[in-house]
């Protein structure tokens, strides 16, 4: 399994929440999707971790590193191998 980890700065919390309502069903339909978690760290920062079955699927599902989404600015995007889960 491979994970897509995205760090964001939250500019508009209401728009960000609405954007997630639209985004999550789309991500769930992506090839190889296993699980996804969107986490608010504080009022201005968040992180998401989306797990895919294979590296190529994770890379295909990763947003551009300099991308934006409603209410957020992406500050980092990485794809890595999942070494363990519980």
Predicted regions: what they are:
Residues 1-47, 53-86:
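Short S/T/G/P-rich N-terminal loop/turn motif that feeds into the first structured element of a domain
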């Amino acid at each position: 399994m491979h994970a897509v980890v995205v760090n964001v700065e939250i500019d508009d919390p209401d728009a960000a929440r609405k954007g997630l309502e639209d985004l999550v069903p789309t991500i769930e339909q992506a090839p190889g999707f296993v699980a996804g978690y969107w986490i608010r760290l504080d009022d201005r920062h968040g992180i998401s971790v989306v797990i895919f079955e294979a590296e190529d699927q994770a890379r295909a599902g990763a947003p551009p590193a300099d991308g934006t989404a409603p209410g957020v600015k992406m500050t980092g995007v990485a794809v890595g191998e999942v070494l363990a889960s519980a």
